[in-house]
Every structure is written in C-alpha cells, then in structure tokens.
C-alpha cells in the first residue's frame, strides 16, 4: 500500500442515460444540499481518513454535543496516510443554526484564549500496521481555547500550507429552555407499517419570546443524519409559554430497518460479518457476506450508523489498528437510481466513493472502501421521488425499527447577534 490511500473508481451507472443522470443529480440536490450546509464531518483530502468527533471519546454518543457548563469535552481525531509528521493547525468557528459562520461575532465573543491557528500536538505514528499512517488528536475545550457561548461549532483543520483539509462539527448546549419528544408508529399515513412520527414540544421556561417565527429555529434528526433533517417545521400550537408539534406530516420518517453491521478485529481470520480476508501484497482485503433482501423484520442489536475503531486486543486502538479494503455486495434488483452506502463513517454524504455499482457477472451491486479496523454499522439508501434519501426497497421498512431521534432548539432573542442552542430533546 506504500502509505497511499487507494482511490475508488467512479464507474458509470449501467444502462443510465445522460438525461436521467441530470435528473438524478437534481434529486440528490436536496439531500446533499442540506448535508453541505450542515458541514458535518468532512474530509477534503485523500490523504486523510477516519475523522471522529466524539464526546469524551465515547463512540456510542449519537451526537457530538456537550454542555456549556459541564465538564465534558469534544475529542477530534483523524489519520494522515502521508505517514511523516505534518504540522496541522485548526480554527474554531461559531456557526448559526444553519451552520453558516456567525458573521456578527468576533472570536473573543465565543472563546476565551485563542480560536485560530492552534497547533495539533498529540501526534502518534502507527505501529505494526501494513498501511502506514500518522494519528492526530486534540480536544475542546482546552487550555488554549475555552468556549463561552452555546450553539454550533465548526473546526477547520489546515495543513502547513494553510490549505483546508477537514471540517469537524459539534454542538454546545445551554439549559435555557426545555423540550420533550415522543415517537409513535401510529402515524398520519399508516399504522404500525413503514413509518414513525415525531411529536414534540418546547417550553420557554420563562424566556420572553415575542416573535417565535423569527426567534426560534428547530431541527429534528433521525440517527444523527443531517441529510434528512427536518428544519423549522411549523408548529401546530403556539402559546405564550411554548410551541408544540402534533400530527405533523413533515415529522414523519421512514422507519427503515436495523442497520447492517460487521466487525474487522483481526487480519488473520474473519470476524463478524466477514466471509474471508485476503492479502494482495500491499494491504488486506475483507470481503463481507453478501447482503441479501430482508422481507421480514428480525430484531438485532445495532448501533444505527455509528462506528468504533478497535482491534482484537482492544489496545492502543488508534495506532495499532490497520487499514483494510472492505468489499460490500448487495443483492437487489437492478435500478436506474444510484445506491449508496450510508453510515457515520461515510460522513452521511453521498459521494462517488460511497456509491455501489452493478456487477453484471455476479448480479450484485458492489463497492469497496478502505476502512480502519473496528465495528461498523451501515445501511443502503437511494434517492426517493422527492429527492430525500430513502432505504433501498429490498432492505425492508418496518415500524418496529429502533431509531434514535433528537430535536434541537435554537434561540436568538431580539437584539442578539447569534443563534444559541438552548434545548435538546430525545425520547
């Protein structure tokens, strides 16, 4: 492998006419547009991989979210395939509810110390791996940068030439308001079938909100996916003390199915979900069992899109875990619409590297990604008629699926200069 990341092919979709390609691009615009605006977790260089943004290093946390007054921290890490040490720096940028930078704030308005040009100094080379890399990590807040305002934050990571290499996003909340959320399978479109519906409410907790349409912004997320976020849905009820959403069709989600999963802990024998592991003289290849159609719901524990880096010894996972070329295959009827792998390890983006391509000889959709050893949960999505990404039909869509929902409440009072994150709700 020689320390270089193997790039994936961008094959043309079989039997897809040029005009249809343009149409599919339009269908994807909504999903990718919101993801791009959210600027969630994004790698901008093929030299970098495995960007993680975790609260207290806990991969089970659904959202990278900390309290303004708590003692938690956001831990950010990534790997660099160039292997040799590079001086990476980062800036911390406060953002509005829509993830655009807060142009009315100076850095001193949201951070004590420094918010620009900070050096990443926790650097470790990989050990005993076939694919060489250097691991970089840092945490916020730290001795140089202490955050003083709630809201959305984007960390911009630069190389020594000050070229933007990655964006890492997280949220800081304050307990100014209170929100509550419930999920039901008795929806306005079906009952105990293929959908789940969210009902929720916001209590102002004494905050004087005079123009809620202007002062309050809301986001509802399923499994932490910003590409499918429901933004500023109009509430059915407004009172002097709060807002409520009941029987709101915009808050109906596809139930989907339990995310598929695999675990690559060792390179000398297959582990969960892996059919075989081979060596090509440069790197290891892990071929997963073919993902077959799921006509029925079968309960299984899954992290619903999360992933965790680890190896069989569960020791020094960050620098002892190797990179493996993972081969995915999906048995599903040929379709004119593209099919994508989706999970937090893809950044919830639908890029060419995450697209599956049809292998006529095998009669399967296939994709391969270079991934760090560990546990991964994933699903297969395709553009729906409205442009939103929906589960591939053969994956199944069942009301029993255990999905994770969050509602975020942002507030900007009259005369204030930015959006604050004042409440977070989950079932």
How should these model regions be labeled?
Residues 1-40:
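Bacterial Sec-dependent N-terminal signal peptides
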Residues 39-68, 176-189, 302-315:
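Short, compositionally biased P/S/T/A/G/V-rich stretches that sit at domain boundaries
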Residues 42-43, 172-195, 398-422:
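Low-complexity, Pro/Ser/Thr- and charge-rich linker/hinge segments at domain boundaries
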Residues 51-96, 191-202, 316-328:
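Contiguous beta-strand segments within globular domains
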Residues 99, 145, 159-165, 267-272, ...:
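Short acidic/polar inter-strand loop motif in beta-rich domains
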Residues 111-136, 226-233, 327-373, 385-414:
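Aromatic-rich carbohydrate-binding modules that target alpha-glucans
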Residues 132-143, 150, 157:
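Ligand-binding face of N-terminal immunoglobulin V-set domains in extracellular IgSF glycoproteins
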Residues 286-335, 427:
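Basic K/R-rich, polyanion-interacting modules in nucleoproteins and related proteins
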């Amino acid at each position: 492998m020689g320390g270089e990341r193997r790039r994936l092919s961008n094959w043309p979709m079989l039997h897809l006419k040029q005009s249809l390609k343009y149409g599919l691009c339009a269908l994807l615009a909504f999903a990718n547009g919101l993801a791009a605006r959210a600027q969630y977790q994004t790698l901008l260089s093929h030299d970098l991989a495995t960007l993680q943004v975790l609260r207290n290093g806990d991969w089970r946390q659904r959202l990278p979210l900390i309290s303004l007054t708590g003692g938690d921290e956001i831990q950010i890490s990534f790997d660099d395939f160039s292997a040799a040490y590079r001086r990476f720096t980062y800036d911390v940028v406060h953002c509005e509810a829509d993830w655009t930078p807060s142009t009315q704030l100076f850095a001193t308005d949201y951070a004590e110390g420094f918010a620009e040009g900070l050096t990443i100094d926790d650097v470790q080379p990989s050990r005993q791996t076939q694919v060489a890399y250097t691991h970089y990590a840092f945490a916020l807040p730290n001795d140089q940068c202490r955050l003083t305002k709630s809201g959305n934050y984007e960390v911009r990571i630069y190389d020594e030439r000050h070229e933007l290499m990655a964006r890492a996003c997280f949220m800081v909340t304050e307990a100014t308001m209170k929100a509550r959320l419930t999920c039901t399978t008795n929806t306005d479109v079906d009952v105990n079938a293929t959908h789940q519906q969210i009902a929720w409410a916001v209590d102002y907790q004494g905050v004087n909100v005079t123009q809620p349409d202007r002062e309050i912004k809301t986001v509802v997320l399923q499994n932490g996916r910003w590409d499918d976020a429901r933004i500023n849905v109009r509430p059915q009820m407004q009172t002097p003390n709060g807002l409520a959403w009941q029987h709101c069709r915009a808050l109906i989600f596809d139930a989907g199915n339990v995310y598929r999963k695999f675990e690559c802990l060792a390179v000398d024998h297959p582990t969960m979900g892996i059919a075989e592991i081979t060596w090509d003289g440069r790197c290891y290849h892990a071929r997963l069992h073919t993902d077959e159609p799921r006509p029925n719901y079968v309960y299984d524990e899954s992290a619903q899109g999360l992933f965790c880096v680890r190896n069989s010894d569960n020791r020094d996972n960050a620098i002892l875990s190797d990179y493996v070329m993972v081969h995915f295959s999906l048995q599903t009827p040929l379709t004119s619409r593209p099919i994508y792998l989706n999970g937090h390890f893809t950044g919830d983006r639908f890029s060419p590297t995450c697209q599956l391509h049809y292998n006529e000889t095998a009669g399967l959709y296939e994709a391969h990604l270079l991934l760090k050893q560990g546990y991964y949960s994933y699903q297969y999505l395709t553009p729906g008629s409205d442009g939103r990404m929906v589960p591939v039909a053969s994956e199944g869509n069942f009301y029993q699926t255990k999905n994770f929902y969050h509602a975020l409440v942002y507030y900007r009072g009259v005369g204030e200069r930015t959006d604050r994150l004042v409440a977070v709700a989950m079932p």
